[in-house]
């Protein structure tokens, strides 16, 4: 299931410069009686974990955990690329899993607040420093029902083995279904500080600091290159016997989707690959990374002509006849950006279109008749279980494919001269 949506033309990454389910929720969340929280202190960052409902019903089907939908507040601040643009146009392009008319209608209904005040002006132009809240019906994506295994815990550190399928922290349609969300809801753990990140479908060693001093120390040593980071991945093809070093710079392809590519004006990146074994079709490879760019191993393995097996994003013909080997895409940067964007639109995951819903949304967006906005005092328990403008409530989604949950990429070991944390080799990496 792709956590992506359409991006307007002026939202695309700049060209390289040439420089180097609908079911009743029987239990109300513990905070369901709370009214909308404003940004009382403009400088205080609101921890989304603190606002998570603690008792959202869920069910497990075929080893997959499905969470019931619930109401939640999305908070953000104006990004540089948003300044001077209409708020509803920005959100239509960047909000995930929504109908193209949703932002305009939500604004009319009074579900969006700017700087603590209800904003119903669909022509509002975003300014630097704007603080935005959006109350919406959240349908979290399903995850595998797997435990988060504790590797080590001290007064300063909490180290776990992250299972595949869930992000580390709140993002997009994930909140409770994140590592931090599950640790809070299931174990009551709070105050953990993320020391590094792993992609949603990646598994392996994940470190948290339990206090500010440890957080600062670890991030300082990380910047100084004192960490040794070892990964294991399974790639397509027979990988060369000799060590392969990739130092291609990496930068964004489609910003709002987080999709990266090799580009001359990207950030420096360095990865070392060494084959462990091959079955003649695929290879298991050990990787040491000296930098930590977004999707670095996935992008570098693609560049080497051996993309990670089953990678829905980077192991695809949309990148060209050789799937992006040597960054030879056989198309312009704009064409690549557009093709990749269209491949991962949320609409591609709908079971079938809902013409009635589409027509209703078109009508509500175009209708100039004033709408009485929702009362700012509206509580969560007063909100409906079915939302008439929520796309997930109105459009059936396809079954999530297995390769969405797991990427054949595992963080095996993180260490410095002072400490070392390691997991067992994943089953798929063990030679039979």
Swiss-Prot record:
The active site is at residue 199. PROSITE patterns: PSI_RLU, S4. Residues 1-42 are annotated as: Disordered. It comes from the Eukaryota. Residues 1-14 have a biased composition (Polar residues). GO terms for molecular function: pseudouridine synthase activity; RNA binding. GO terms for biological process: enzyme-directed rRNA pseudouridine synthesis. Residues 85-148 form the S4 RNA-binding domain. It holds the Pfam family PseudoU_synth_2. Keywords: RNA-binding. Residues 18-30 have a biased composition (Basic and acidic residues). SUPFAM superfamilies: Pseudouridine synthase. Belongs to the pseudouridine synthase RluA family. This is Uncharacterized protein K07E8.7. It comes from Caenorhabditis elegans.
